[in-house]
From Swiss-Prot:
It comes from Rickettsia africae (strain ESF-5). This is 3-deoxy-manno-octulosonate cytidylyltransferase. Belongs to the KdsB family. The lineage of its organism: Bacteria, Pseudomonadati, Pseudomonadota, Alphaproteobacteria, Rickettsiales. It is an enzyme of class 2 (transferase). One of its GO terms (cellular component) is cytosol. Activates KDO (a required 8-carbon sugar) for incorporation into bacterial lipopolysaccharide in Gram-negative bacteria. It is found in: Cytoplasm.
């Protein structure tokens, strides 16, 4: 298999404030977390895991041949859960890169995962994350995050507001991160920062501490499921692609 020095970890906890038992919600006849895992697994990496605190989630994943790492339900963030899972991977001394894929993107494209792995390995960034160009109308309809970058694509700032102010085209941030191992270790050792707490965005802890995040353009905005309304959109999208035989 390719990229033997890379682990992909999908953090997934059962409890959710906005959508009850979110990972187990159905899209068609298949749960959200199974759809995420199936998409990620198509990237073809041996070290692909779901990190969870839930026997129910674990059962869903193991039934389709996936690997599960159990982590404590008290772990505060997805990145912390990713790191705790990484420490439990057998022979993890051979893993130099860790990709954190959020467990709420049921149609994430495997090509996007492979693209950020290649970009991370061929750059000097601590962390790499995907972005998509979107227009004002598209991003206004989204509750997600935009990013400002410099001419080389290095992230300058992430915000839940539209940045830069006054623009007609924006860079939408996709919730997936490729970490160098030492960068992930450093990140979890740092305390939450002012901007991170203000914007409620973990990646600002990275920038406030002088670490670097490179951005990698991908083509499509994946659907993220955080609310009941998001779930309805995901179900509708699935129904549409099913009719087309995709």
């Amino acid at each position: 298999m390719r990229h033997q020095d890379v682990a992909i970890i999908i953090p997934s906890r059962l409890s959710s404030t906005r959508l009850k038992q979110k990972p187990l919600q159905l899209i068609g006849s298949i749960t959200l977390i199974e759809r995420v895992f199936t998409q990620v697994n198509q990237a073809g990496l041996e070290h692909t895991y779901v990190a969870t605190d839930s026997e129910e989630i674990a059962s869903v994943i193991t039934k389709v041949g996936g690997k599960v790492i159990f982590t404590d339900s008290a772990i505060p963030t997805g990145t912390d859960r990713t790191y705790e899972a990484f420490k439990l991977i057998p022979n993890n001394q051979n893993i130099n890169y860790i990709v954190n894929v959020q467990g709420d993107m049921p149609f994430i494209e495997p090509s996007s995962i492979l693209k950020i792995i290649e970009y991370l390995k061929n750059s000097k960034y601590d962390i790499v994350t995907p972005i998509v160009k979107v227009d004002r109308e598209s991003v206004k309809a989204s509750s997600n995050v935009t990013v400002a970058v410099d001419s080389a694509g290095t992230a300058l700032y992430f915000s839940r507001s539209l940045i830069p102010n006054g623009a007609e085209e924006f860079l939408y941030h996709v919730g997936m991160y490729g970490f160098r191992k030492n960068a992930l270790e450093k990140f979890v050792s740092l305390k939450p920062t002012f901007l991170e707490k203000t914007e409620r965005l973990e990646q600002l802890r990275v920038l406030e501490n002088g670490m670097t995040i490179g951005t990698c353009l991908v083509e499509n905005v994946p659907i993220s499921v955080d609310t009941e309304e998001d779930l309805k959109k995901a179900v509708k999208f699935y129904e549409n692609i099913s009719k087309l035989g995709l």
